Amino acid sequence: MATDDDRFPWDQDSILSRDLLSASSMQLCYEKLNRSCVRSPYSPGPRLILYAVFGFGAVLAVCGNLLVMTSILHFRQLHSPANFLVASLACADFLVGLTVMPFSMVRSVEGCWYFGDIYCKFHSSFDGSFCYSSIFHLCFISADRYIAVSDPLIYPTRFTASVSGKCITFSWLLSIIYSFSLFYTGVNEAGLEDLVSALTCVGGCQIAVNQSWVFINFLLFLVPALVMMTVYSKIFLIAKQQAQNIEKMGKQTARASESYKDRVAKRERKAAKTLGIAVAAFLLSWLPYFIDSIIDAFLGFVTPTYVYEILVWIGYYNSAMNPLIYAFFYPWFRKAIKLIVTGKILRENSSATNLFPE
C-alpha cells in the first residue's frame, strides 16, 4: 500500500530502493530492457524452501477447497442452505489458490512479475475480490449460526435456500464490483501520480492505493469483523445458557419434543463452534495485514518489504485452513473425503450415501 504524496512527503530514491537494488549488485528482471525492474534473487537454498512453502499452500488451498465443494454439492445429505454458504466460501478460497497464490509465489521469490501488465491488474482485482467475498460469506455464516442456535426449531423456515442464495449473490457481486472498479478506474492512484511513475518498471506489479481507499478497504474488513465478533459472543452466551439448562434437567425424563429440541440445539452449537473457529482463523490471518496497510498509508512506507510479504502470505494461507478445520471437527467431511479419494463417489447412487453416524 502507498501513502498519499500530497499530504506526506516521500523520497523517490528510498521508494525505488524497495524494488531496485543498488547498481553494484544489479540483476534485472529482463536483462535486455532499459526500463526493467531490478531483482534481488534468493540463494538456491532459501529459494527452494520458499517455493516449497508457498507452493504447498497453493496446492492445499486448491485441493482442500475442491474437496469441500465436491462433498457439499455431490452428497444430497449435505444439501442445506447453510452448507451452500460454506461451499461458496470454499469456492472463494479455491480461486485464491488457483488465480492468486501461484503468481504471488513467483513474485515473492523472484522479486519480479513475469505475467504482464494486464494480468497484474487482474491479479490484484482477484486478490481483493476473493478476500472481501470471504469476509462477507463469513459474516452471513455468523448470522446463520446465530439463528440456528437461538431458535433451532424455527431456523429451517427462516434461513431458506432462497435466503442463502441472496447472501451468496451479495457476497460475490459486491466484492467483485468493488475490487475491479477500484483498480480499473484508477481512483486508487489519485494523488499518487508521481509515486506511480517512480515505481513503474518492466517486471513489476506495484499497485499504489491512496489514503482514502486504504481507509475504505480497512473499514470493509473491520465492520464485518466487528459484526462477526458481536454475533459469536451472543452465540456462545446462548450456548452456555442452553448447556446450563440441560445440566439442570439432569436425568429427568423430558417430553419427546423437548428431547428432540435438545438434540437439534446440540448439533447447531457444534456447527457454530466449528465455524466460529474458521471465523477466528480468518480474522487473525488478515488483521495484521490490514493494520499494516493503515500504517503504511498514513506513516509512509515504514514496513520493510519482507515483513509485508510475510503478512500477505499469512493471509493467503488462510485459504488453505478451512478444509483442515472441517476435517478435524467434522466426521462427515472425513468420510466424504475418503469416498472421493477412493473413487467410490463415481458409483451409482453414491450421492445418497449416509455421511452421519447413527
Curated annotation (Swiss-Prot):
GO terms for molecular function: trace-amine receptor activity. Disulfide bonds join C37-C201, C120-C205. The keyword Cytoplasm does not apply. GO terms for biological process: G protein-coupled receptor signaling pathway. InterPro entries: GPCR_Rhodpsn, GPCR_Rhodpsn_7TM, TAAR, TAAR_fam. Residues 69-83, 148-166, 233-274, 333-358 are cytoplasmic. Residues 1-47, 105-125, 188-211, 296-309 are extracellular. Glycans are attached at N34, N210. Its main location: membrane. The keyword Nucleotide-binding does not apply. The chain crosses the membrane at residues 48-68, 84-104, 126-147, 167-187, 212-232, 275-295, 310-332. SUPFAM superfamilies: Family A G protein-coupled receptor-like. SMART domains: 7TM_GPCR_Srsx. One of its GO terms (cellular component) is plasma membrane. It is found in: Cell membrane. Keywords: Cell membrane, Disulfide bond, G-protein coupled receptor, Glycoprotein, Membrane, Receptor, Transducer, Transmembrane, Transmembrane helix. Gene3D superfamilies: Rhodopsin 7-helix transmembrane proteins. It is a multi-pass membrane protein. Belongs to the G-protein coupled receptor 1 family. Olfactory receptor specific for N,N-dimethylalkylamines trace amines, such as N,N-dimethylcyclohexylamine. Trace amine compounds are enriched in animal body fluids and act on trace amine-associated receptors (TAARs) to elicit both intraspecific and interspecific innate behaviors. Ligand-binding causes a conformation change that triggers signaling via G(s)-class of G alpha proteins (GNAL or GNAS). In addition to the well known disulfide bond common to G-protein coupled receptor 1 family, trace amine-associated receptors (TAARs) contain an unique disulfide bond (Cys-37-Cys-201) connecting the N-terminus to the extracellular Loop 2 (ECL2), which is required for agonist-induced receptor activation. This is Trace amine-associated receptor 7b.
